[in-house]
Amino acid sequence: MTQVAKKILVTCALPYANGSIHLGHMLEHIQADVWVRYQRMRGHEVNFICADDAHGTPIMLKAQQLGITPEQMIGEMSQEHQTDFAGFNISYDNYHSTHSEENRQLSELIYSRLKENGFIKNRTISQLYDPEKGMFLPDRFVKGTCPKCKSPDQYGDNCEVCGATYSPTELIEPKSVVSGATPVMRDSEHFFFDLPSFSEMLQAWTRSGALQEQVANKMQEWFESGLQQWDISRDAPYFGFEIPNAPGKYFYVWLDAPIGYMGSFKNLCDKRGDSVSFDEYWKKDSTAELYHFIGKDIVYFHSLFWPAMLEGSNFRKPTNLFVHGYVTVNGAKMSKSRGTFIKASTWLNHFDADSLRYYYTAKLSSRIDDIDLNLEDFVQRVNADIVNKVVNLASRNAGFINKRFDGVLASELADPELYKTFTDAAEVIGEAWESREFGKAVREIMALADLANRYVDEQAPWVVAKQEGRDADLQAICSMGINLFRVLMTYLKPVLPKLTERAEAFLNTELTWDGIQQPLLGHKVNPFKALYNRIDMKQVEALVEASKEEVKATTAPVTGPLADDPIQETITFDDFAKVDLRVALIENAEFVEGSDKLLRLTLDLGGEKRNVFSGIRSAYPDPQALIGRHTIMVANLAPRKMRFGISEGMVMAAGPGGKDIFLLSPDAGAKPGHQVK
């Protein structure tokens, strides 16, 4: 069935221009690229764009640390990012920057329309201000104690321990991340986007059925909580676009970042002249399709602020958001210390791009699920699927065709019904690519690969080749195998661009979706060359080690206590919550006969007595001095039978050991039995 050609604009979230691309980023760009390549194979007009997100305080401060201008830093980072994406064969039509004249003009245009339409409000707010650096502090540049769970060293917008959200002014004992100074409160006039005015429109958009169910459900929670006005301004000093007629005020990075999609496309239109129309894709009544591939961490901005901004400034809204989950490696969060925080460029020094493209694709679906890159499974799957099932199908047949028949395929199919089974699968596989059910598409393709290899096994061309008078049979069998290989590679073309190029060179024909309906008969193929090499765990080990070495090279050496006693593996809040810490009064302290390390402590928990053995004797030669002190103990530690008796808990102490052990004590006012929270 012939499809009507569509005009489609596809974007990926804009990478922030203060760091390298890593394998977490690559999931999204690979997912989008596979989808885009499939759309192009089906004859649709696709414009695939991206840009660097190049504004904000973090970029300004990092440039200062490096002793260069922000413009120089983002320019160098853009080149690095584009090199990485090209290395993974991401087929962007344009890659730009939010720090561009196109983006400035569009940001000012959208702001002016929102203002004219009454959606921009002014009001004075109180903010934390760094008196040493002379700057207002964004949320992430303030740290202090969480006002909810009292965990120290938490950012100014949310607690990474208990998950609570709050404003920077709610932090206990806040400190500037920039200078370490205690911030002060200062008033400043800010500009707010009236998001609540768009609640009805956004709810209708949510109910349209276009969005993923998980996204729609999350949006409904936000609607029920009530939408708030959105602060779209920041005070100088700030690296970004100054707001028109508001000296010293700048657009918040999240205002001009999504407009960067438009800016990059405008840049592409200007390059191509009349062949692409900006208005055709962005005007209010546009019939072109607009899709944003994004991670689940930025759904809020793309599902609420962005469509509301577009609606309020008379531009079209996205057709849909395609949201994905995070990447874990070997079942855990990417870790620099374990060597699993892997940069895109590091990967390409050890593996080809097609291998990761295939592994991610095989695991992706249309749901917002996290993807685990299990490196051992990665090696096994790439070898089993790409090498053993697909490439091997070509290699085990091509030799006979090249040597015995001068590269010419048979003039008829040996098994037309089997070939029809392969071509009939185009509809199911195509629908899976279209609906982003990538894992399903791969499973369907590999099931066909199994059928193809079973055919070759049953026909045994290596046996036929030794039998006189069966040259025609040999040519027919091997030609059938090569034709089935051609169909498989056509289905895999969106995923494996480099392998596809080599396959097309061997087959001496371009692989097209509709082309498989006509098998290659009497066709001359080129001499077969190895299409793909097996991979092994030694490459994985080298990759992990290289990632560790990169971290060492870019990280200042740790000195002091952390050098001798590194921080342990991360635990979850649920794990931490199991530990019951209590204030205890030391009623008695005495030596333990037969031990030169232990003291026996009698602790009062406020109505309950505990006997605890503690290895602090070297630091407290006079145990009587501890009597009457308050300390902290682990109250729910299972009793431990020791040679000297049963220890019913553990007291908390710090220090490297020996004489340098320091028993922890609470502030004055804490009572025995109080829980430490």
From Swiss-Prot:
Annotated Gene3D superfamilies: HUPs, Isoleucyl-tRNA Synthetase, Domain 1, Methionyl-tRNA synthetase, Zn-domain, Nucleic acid-binding proteins
One GO molecular-function entry: methionine-tRNA ligase activity
Major place of residence: cytoplasm
Short sequence motif named 'KMSKS' region, residue ranges: 333-337
Binding positions (ATP): K336
Positions of Zn(2+) binding: C146, C149, C159, C162
Cofactor note: Binds 1 zinc ion per subunit.
SUPFAM superfamilies hit by this protein: Anticodon-binding domain of a subclass of class I aminoacyl-tRNA synthetases, Methionyl-tRNA synthetase (MetRS), Zn-domain, Nucleic acid-binding proteins, Nucleotidylyl transferase
Keywords, sorted A to Z: Aminoacyl-tRNA synthetase, ATP-binding, Cytoplasm, Ligase, Metal-binding, Nucleotide-binding, Protein biosynthesis, RNA-binding, tRNA-binding, Zinc
Pfam families hit by this protein: Anticodon_3, tRNA-synt_1g, tRNA_bind
Catalytic activity entry: tRNA(Met) + L-methionine + ATP = L-methionyl-tRNA(Met) + AMP + diphosphate
EC numbers, comma separated: 6.1.1.10
Keyword match Ribonucleoprotein: no
Compartments where found: Cytoplasm
Domain of life: Bacteria
One GO CC annotation: cytosol
Binding partners and assembly: Homodimer.
Function recorded in the entry: Is required not only for elongation of protein synthesis but also for the initiation of all mRNA translation through initiator tRNA(fMet) aminoacylation.
Family per similarity comment: Belongs to the class-I aminoacyl-tRNA synthetase family. MetG type 1 subfamily.
Matching HAMAP family: Met_tRNA_synth_type1 (MF_00098)
Protein name: Methionine--tRNA ligase
Gene coding for it: metG
